[in-house]
């Protein structure tokens, strides 16, 4: 714990989020901007707020997030993972509920690398019979 802030690191795809939470009125600031300005899609906003709504802490904490790497979906997932870890740092009794919802587990799926001789990771060149 840093001062009165609780900390959690979240990761998803190639995005990394450093999340700091403290008691407040529910403001979420991502890279210096309000969350509604940073994430354009409503689904991204919903993903980020899931752990707070599950634990009934949506208006309880002020949250500051530094997130880098990846795209919008990856960053939203990383922020959700970081908020989950910060909530557990704040109150360990929340872990079972968050774990049952699947928020504690890091989503290990990464982009598969492109292979030599193929167009993409698995897409082969078109076969020509003649």
Curated annotation (Swiss-Prot):
InterPro entries on file: Ribosomal_Su5_D2-typ_SF, Ribosomal_uS9, Ribosomal_uS9_bac/plastid, Ribosomal_uS9_CS, Ribsml_uS5_D2-typ_fold_subgr
PROSITE patterns: RIBOSOMAL_S9
tRNA processing listed as a keyword: no
Keywords attached to this entry: Ribonucleoprotein, Ribosomal protein
Matches recorded under Gene3D superfamilies: 3.30.230.10
Listed GO CC annotations: cytosolic small ribosomal subunit
Keyword NAD assigned: no
GO molecular function: RNA binding; structural constituent of ribosome
Any single GO BP term: translation
Superkingdom of origin: Bacteria
Family to which the UniProt record says this protein belongs: Belongs to the universal ribosomal protein uS9 family.
Descriptive protein name: Small ribosomal subunit protein uS9
Gene coding for it: rpsI
């Amino acid at each position: 714990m840093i001062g009165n802030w609780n900390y959690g690191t979240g990761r998803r795809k190639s995005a990394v989020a450093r999340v700091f939470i403290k008691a407040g009125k529910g403001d979420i600031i991502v890279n210096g901007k309000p969350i509604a300005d940073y994430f354009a899609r409503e689904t991204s906003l919903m993903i980020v707020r899931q752990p707070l709504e599950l634990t009934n802490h949506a208006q309880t904490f002020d949250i500051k997030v530094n997130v880098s790497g990846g795209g919008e979906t990856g960053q939203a997932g990383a922020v959700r993972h970081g908020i989950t870890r910060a909530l557990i740092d704040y109150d360990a009794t929340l872990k079972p509920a968050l774990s049952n919802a699947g928020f504690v587990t890091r989503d290990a799926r990464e982009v598969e690398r492109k292979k030599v001789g193929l167009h993409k990771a698995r897409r082969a060149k078109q076969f020509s019979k003649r």
